């Protein structure tokens, strides 16, 4: 597992919309926009239903995550991160708690996650490689 550099942790804390890429049974990519957070040394996301992305991860845990850094006016190429990881699925009520915590980042500090409390799934991403354009690239090499 590759440690997550402080610069990438800082980016994740800003609440970037994240693209999760999984592999469909036919080998084609499946991409979903998700909320992302940190839990110790792992990136994590919460999901209340067992959607295609979860079924794909059950079959093949290899995933890619990508997210843009906040735009800097006048810069030619915006910073972004691409993370290759292996995902594991953790069923339970921790998913709602995670989504409620992330709602405060992605929506507003007083927000509550709008879905009813219940069981769901936490995807935990063990980072294998970090790429993109930004300080997290040199920090991870």
Where in the sequence are the language-model features?
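Extreme N-terminal tail/first-helix region
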Residues: 1-17
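Helix-adjacent hinge/juxtasegments
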Residues: 46-78
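A generic structural signal for nonpolar/aromatic side chains embedded in well-ordered alpha-helices
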Residues: 11-12, 56-57, 102, 125
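Short beta-strand segments
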Residues: 15-49, 65-68
